Regions:
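Charged, often flexible domain-edge or linker segments that flank or initiate folded functional domains
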Residues: 1-17
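SAM-dependent nucleic-acid methyltransferase catalytic core
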Residues: 17-152, 156-166
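Conserved S-adenosyl-L-methionine
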Residues: 1-3, 164, 169-172
C-alpha cells in the first residue's frame, strides 16, 4: 500500500480469488483443530492457491494485486482468531457453547469471505497518488541506506527466558 498509487482490486479479481481450487491443502493438513475449523482451513488453502495463480497480471500490477490479496487474507485470519493471536491452540474459545460478554463471537462467526471482501475494500480505499514516489522495502535495518521520512520496524516477539539467541523468537508463531 505504501508504493501502490493506482492499482486496485476489481470485482473480477475478487471472483477469481474466491473460485474453487483444491490445488493446496497445507493449512488444512497441518493446522487442523488448532486455529480454524476444517472448512475455514480449506478456504484459506483455496485463496492461497488462487493468489499464487494470479499470473494473468505481470510486473508491479501483479505485485500490488498480490499484496492487496495477502493483506486481506492475513487480516481476515487475524480477525477470526481469539484475541488476534496465534501463540496457542485455542479454537475451543470460538466453538464452546457458552454465553459471551464481549462482541468477538459475531466476528468469529462471520464467514471468512465476508471479512476478506471487507479488507479488499479497505485496501482499495487506501490506494491514492500523493504525487511522491513512495518506496517500501523488506531488508535488515542495518542494510538501509539513504534518508527516509518514515521507517517502520516490526521485530519478532521475543522470549525473555530463552537460553541463547536461537531461542529468542517465540516458537509459538508457526502460522
Amino acid at each position: 500500500l505504501i508504493e501502490n498509487n493506482k492499482v486496485r482490486f476489481t470485482s473480477e479479481d475478487l471472483i477469481n480469488l474466491l473460485k474453487e481450487n483444491n490445488q493446496f491443502n497445507f493449512v488444512y493438513k497441518n493446522f487442523r483443530d488448532i486455529y480454524y475449523l476444517d472448512y475455514e482451513n480449506k478456504w484459506i488453502d483455496k485463496v492461497m492457491a488462487n493468489i499464487l495463480n494470479m499470473n494473468h497480471y505481470t510486473g508491479t500490477e501483479l505485485e500490488y494485486k498480490k499484496a492487496i490479496s495477502y493483506y486481506a487474507l492475513f487480516q481476515a485470519c487475524l480477525i477470526k482468531r481469539p484475541f488476534n493471536l496465534f501463540h496457542r491452540k485455542n479454537l475451543y474459545i470460538r466453538t464452546n457453547k457458552v454465553e459471551r460478554e464481549f462482541g468477538n463471537k459475531i466476528t468469529w462467526d462471520k464467514a471468512f469471505h465476508l471479512h476478506f471482501k471487507n479488507f479488499i475494500k479497505e485496501a482499495n480505499e487506501h490506494v491514492f497518488d500523493n504525487g511522491k514516489k513512495c518506496k517500501a522495502t523488506n531488508i535488515s535495518v542495518f542494510d538501509i541506506k539513504g534518508k527516509y521520512d518514515l521507517v517502520y520496524l516490526d521485530p519478532p516477539y521475543l522470549n525473555k527466558l530463552a537460553n541463547n539467541e536461537h531461542e529468542t523468537v517465540d516458537p509459538g508463531y508457526p502460522f
